[in-house]
Every structure is written in structure tokens, then in C-alpha cells.
């Protein structure tokens, strides 16, 4: 047990550069890749059948244009973002603009549906 505690203490004292070098050395020694482990860990959250490794997990919702119902879109933007009336109006009039960044697919699809229902054109990136 004391040996494990010493290992924990040693690892805790590493700098970021030293930790990165350690990761590279362990990858080479064990024949694994840390990047593959991340992709495998993300795949179960994607649901369904075998998802491609490059499937995105974070999306940016971009308001492409307000369409014909600008007032409805401004109301939805306020509800989604919590912005004030002037800020939401400026965002809608300045389209294309990112509305939400770094959201998961489910949240991005929900926001997109809300905005499209209000008459906006929306892109997911």
C-alpha cells in the first residue's frame, strides 16, 4: 500500500509537460493510444449502433437568419439564452451569429427545433 501511495505522490508532483511525456512513454510501452480511449469512451453516449469515431459530441448552434418572423425569433433567443431584449435583438439582426457553443447533440437539436418553429434558419456546426 505504501508503494501505491508513493506512486500517487510522485505522479501528483509532475508538471504538465512531464505528465504528457509520461503518457507518451506509457503509450509506446503498452502499445495503446490515449486518443483511442477517449473515442471509445465517447461512443456509448452516442447511442444506437456502432458510431463512427469522428462523430462530434459538442456543437455550436448558429442563427443563420431570422426569417420573416423576427419578433418570434427574438422571443425564442431571449428564452434560450437569457439575454435582455436589446441584446437578443442585436444578435438576431446580426445573423449569422453563434447562439450556443459547446452543447451536446440533444441540446443543440432542441434549440434548433425551437428556433425553426419560430421561423429562423439555424445551422449546427
Swiss-Prot record:
GO terms for biological process: translation. Signal peptide: none annotated. GO terms for molecular function: mRNA binding; structural constituent of ribosome. Two isoforms seem to exist. One is probably dimethylated on Lys-69 and monomethylated on Lys-86 while the other is probably acetylated or trimethylated on both Lys-86 and Lys-89. InterPro entries: Ribosomal_bL12 (IPR000206), Ribosomal_bL12_C (IPR013823), Ribosomal_bL12_C/ClpS-like (IPR014719), Ribosomal_bL12_oligo (IPR008932), Ribosomal_bL12_oligo_N_sf (IPR036235). The keyword Hydrolase does not apply. GO terms for cellular component: cytosolic large ribosomal subunit. PANTHER family: 39S RIBOSOMAL PROTEIN L12, LARGE RIBOSOMAL SUBUNIT PROTEIN BL12M. Forms part of the ribosomal stalk which helps the ribosome interact with GTP-bound translation factors. Is thus essential for accurate translation. This is Large ribosomal subunit protein bL12. It comes from Rhodopseudomonas palustris (strain ATCC BAA-98 / CGA009). The lineage of its organism: Bacteria, Pseudomonadati, Pseudomonadota, Alphaproteobacteria, Hyphomicrobiales.
Amino acid at each position: 500500500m505504501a508503494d501505491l501511495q508513493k506512486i500517487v505522490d510522485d505522479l501528483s508532483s509532475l508538471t504538465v509537460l512531464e505528465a504528457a511525456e509520461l503518457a507518451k512513454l506509457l503509450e509506446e510501452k503498452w502499445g495503446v493510444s490515449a486518443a483511442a480511449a477517449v473515442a471509445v469512451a465517447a461512443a456509448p453516449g452516442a447511442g444506437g449502433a456502432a458510431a463512427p469515431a469522428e462523430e462530434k459530441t459538442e456543437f455550436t448552434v448558429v442563427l443563420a437568419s431570422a426569417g420573416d418572423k423576427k419578433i418570434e425569433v427574438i422571443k425564442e433567443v431571449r428564452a434560450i439564452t437569457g439575454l435582455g431584449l436589446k441584446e437578443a435583438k442585436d444578435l438576431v439582426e446580426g445573423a449569422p451569429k453563434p447562439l450556443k457553443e459547446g452543447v451536446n447533440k440533444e441540446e443543440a437539436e432542441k434549440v434548433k427545433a425551437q428556433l425553426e418553429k419560430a421561423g429562423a434558419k439555424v445551422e449546427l456546426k
